[in-house]
Amino acid sequence: MEDGGAGLRAPRYPAEDTSPTTDRELRGFFCYGLAAEVFAVCAVGSFLPVTLEQLAREQGVLFIDKVTPCTAKNATVIANATVNALMSRAEGSDTHQCIINVFGAELTTASFAMYTFSASVFMQALALVSVSSVADHGTWRKKLLAGFGLTGSVSAMLFLLVVPQIFVVGSFLTVICVVCLGCSFVILNSYLPLLVLNHPVVQSDEDHPTASSSIPLQPISPQRSSRKSEESLHQVNRKEVDIGSKADSSDLQLSTKISSKGVGIGYMAAVSVQVICILILYIMNKTGVSSTLPLRTVLFFVGSWWLTFTIPSVMWLRDRPGPPLPTALYEGRAFVRTCMSYTIFAWKSLWKTVKVAVKLRQVLLFLIAWFLLSDAVATISATAILFARTELQMGTVAVALLSIIATSSGIIGATVWPIISKRFTLKTNHIIVCCLLLLELVPLYGLLGFLPFVQAWGVGGLQKWYEIYPLGIIHGMVMGGLSSYCRSFYGLLIPPGSEAAFYALFAITDKGSSAVGPAIVGKIVDATGQIRPAFGFLAVLIALPIPLIWMVDVEKGQEDAIRMAGLMKTTDDGHEDFESFEGSSDGHEAEGLMRDHD
């Protein structure tokens, strides 16, 4: 494959690189997934929240008296803290939380970590919108991938220098790391349709040359063709759907194969690196060094991993420039004008997609559910780690082991859920509901700790550290199902030809919502001094999307999507004409379209 083996297709725009995809380029694609996925799982999903909490803890005082240092070494101070803790327990306020002062605000160390991640995800959502157009247009694709990879990895490595006295710096570095990670994945994902389109397997298929061009090049088309009659509209729809169904045999299968392989490589590497990190923590903890140094060393190692594998990835990937955008959207210097043009185009595209999505009732229903669902999933992960660290007093090695168990269970879940679906002939939304019901067990089990008779047992309701590991297995199994089924279910509801725009909206909804839950949990912890009450909020948050997911009508959503796709292609001069769209009816016309679509 290295030399291609298929003739070059005609370029669709000036300066398009139509050279066949090579093994070297595919290795570059997989290599960056290997680099960044490790940081996403090992750092963001495990060690970053623990490190932030521990850095702050070493500068904090106990919540119960707001005087005693949390990491006091003096015997007298420790004795006084123990007495205070026993008195607090007798009063029914068992807490191990510490408080710190951040820019004049009094926060618990756990809420400090939650607020940091809330801010990180919010900034990431804003950045993803602005970067989305750059990923599909112009010549900055490879440069930005290298820039985000370099900036994010170096920021992670700088944690080695963050001592407890400057713990707030760790918060800023976390924001930079998370934003760079998200943006680099957007850039990397923009390579996938191009690698598929230029792959020799696809180029050699002469049966559907038009279908290849249906692979999204930009978030949303700025111009549409002239208006046709209603009859012509449906004829165009039938042709496009027929072409798309044929294209699935090669384009979609190849895309799925490449994407699945990349995810598999990334997760296997993440588990392996997680094991290495546990060894680093175990060895360094035996030396009696500062309690934060082993964690900071682990982040340095994970950041170095990210940087190391980013270098060959950038070397092996081609530039693959996209179609340029007009820079007349903003007046000013050339560089500033270009940056503003890309940013304005991205936000305009998002707004246009939102207006279309609002007209598609089933899409809107799912996106509301997805907003709640993704927020619940992101929040429960961070909450569980901090609960294990602060309430259950688990060490860093034990928390890292919990992350490995959850990740491994996720891989198993991705395999098991399709088997369950086939065995019991469950629809996709039914599988999602089953996953949510299973996930609901996690906060409900934590709430059992409030019951007096459970407290009298001394076990149950997450009173012992070992109880969290079975819950980690449940969480991992659920994530293995949700991560794949939600995306595929959403894909059934979006208009054909607008995949890039609607999946961008899907990702932005995910990241935007994930900033809400951690902030609310942080407020709860600040008010109560405990994390356990936050399980009540999480139980409600997980339950809310269940009826919404159940209500989504896939067949009606597909009908509406096809009709909207036709309407979008027949509006005059790109002006939106969606006000008249009222959703599908029960008529035979829609049924005929669905038969063509199937």
From Swiss-Prot:
Topology with respect to the bilayer: Multi-pass membrane protein
InterPro entries reported in the protein's UniProt record: Atg22 (IPR044738), Atg22-like (IPR024671), ATG22/LtaA_families (IPR050495), MFS_trans_sf (IPR036259)
Basic and acidic residues bias spans: 227-238, 585-598
Pfam family name, one: ATG22
Superkingdom: Eukaryota
Function: Vacuolar effluxer which mediate the efflux of amino acids resulting from autophagic degradation. The release of autophagic amino acids allows the maintenance of protein synthesis and viability during nitrogen starvation.
Sugar-modified residues: 74, 80, 285
Annotated GO biological process: amino acid transmembrane export from vacuole; autophagy
Protein name: Autophagy-related protein 22-1
Region (Disordered): 1-20, 207-238, 575-598
Localization in the cell: Vacuole membrane
Family: Belongs to the ATG22 family.
Taxonomic placement: Eukaryota, Fungi, Dikarya, Ascomycota, Pezizomycotina
Keyword set, alphabetical order: Amino-acid transport, Autophagy, Glycoprotein, Membrane, Transmembrane, Transmembrane helix, Transport, Vacuole
